[in-house]
A protein has these predicted regions:
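N-terminal cap/lid segment of alpha/beta-hydrolase-fold proteins
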Residues: 1-35
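Acidic catalytic loop of the alpha/beta-hydrolase fold
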Residues: 194-199, 226-227
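Catalytic active-site module of serine/aspartate enzymes centered on a nucleophile-bearing elbow/loop
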Residues: 222-223, 228-245
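Serine-hydrolase catalytic machinery in alpha/beta-hydrolase-like enzymes
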Residues: 40-134, 177
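Conserved alpha/beta-hydrolase "acid-adjacent" motif
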Residues: 175-176, 197-203
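Short beta-strand/loop motif that positions the catalytic acidic residue
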Residues: 184, 190-192
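Catalytic histidine neighborhood in serine/cysteine hydrolases
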Residues: 204-205, 209-227
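Primarily recognizes the serine-hydrolase "nucleophile elbow" in alpha/beta-hydrolase
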Residues: 119-183
Length: 245
């Protein structure tokens, strides 16, 4: 792991950009933390509006640090400047054609769109965790927040270092991931925008039902994809405060 830049922001946040092999990421920590800080992994959206420096992501990170946590994100395949697997480009084209024609989105399209991303992104997150948890100012427990929902589902199913998660229901989910969700037993707080045109609501409900967690909350709000009310974020903060502090 190598830190390649460092700056102190005006709200008491230390921002450090790092590389781990081919992985690029950013770590945000409280500038004056006296003890190791619990860590929250921030997932990203796929596509050109994602990336390490997207305004929404940076705002989430700074808000997370203001709540007393460390926050980190990595540039996963298909976000920002990092190219995704070629098969996902074709799947994205097939998805767009199906939606424009009013046809159902098949399981094959969803698998080709999501599974290749998981095969790269999940090992990248595990390598990032390996490196960050060696730092003296970072400690457990570890939470996951947001992004393409299938990524934290698989990560939580296979990596016991993830102890709680806030999930954003708003992306397509392969059937194999719904099955894998039965292995996820950590506390979960799931946000669902009820009127999100790009979200298969029933798929989101099926995924929530499949989770094996004894503590899981579905927080549904009226409105579209970008209409998440501020109080929903406040509820998510309280969730992490209960489970990570």
């Amino acid at each position: 792991m190598q830190f390649i830049s460092e700056q102190r922001l005006d709200d008491g946040v230390l921002e450090r950009e790092f590389t781990i092999g081919e992985i690029r990421g950013i770590l945000w920590t409280p500038e004056s933390a006296a003890t190791p800080t619990p860590l929250i992994l921030l997932g990203q959206i796929a596509g050109p509006n994602g990336g390490l420096r997207s305004p929404r992501l940076v705002a989430r990170a700074r808000h997370t640090v203001a709540e007393g946590f460390a926050a980190t994100t990595i540039e996963f395949p298909g976000s920002g400047d990092r190219p995704g697997p070629a098969v996902t480009d074709q799947a994205r084209t097939d998805l767009r054609k199906a939606l424009q024609a009013g046809k159902p989105v098949t399981d094959d399209i969803v698998d080709r769109l999501i599974l290749p991303l998981l095969d790269q992104a999940v090992p990248d997150w595990q390598a990032t965790l390996d490196a960050l948890l060696e730092l003296p100012d970072i400690g457990g427990p570890v939470g996951f927040s947001g992004g393409v929902i299938s990524i934290p589902v698989r990560l939580a199913a296979i990596d016991p270092r993830i102890t709680s998660a806030v999930l954003f229901a708003g992306s397509y989910v392969p059937r194999s991931i719904i099955e894998q969700a039965r292995q996820v037993t950590i506390p979960l707080h799931v946000l669902l925008q009820w009127d999100d045109e790009g979200n298969d609501r029933q798929m989101a409900l099926d995924l929530f039902d499949a989770f094996g967690s004894k503590e899981k909350t579905l927080h549904a709000n009226m409105g579209g994809h970008t209409g998440v009310p501020q109080f929903a974020g406040e509820e998510a903060n309280r969730f992490f405060a209960r489970h990570l502090k």
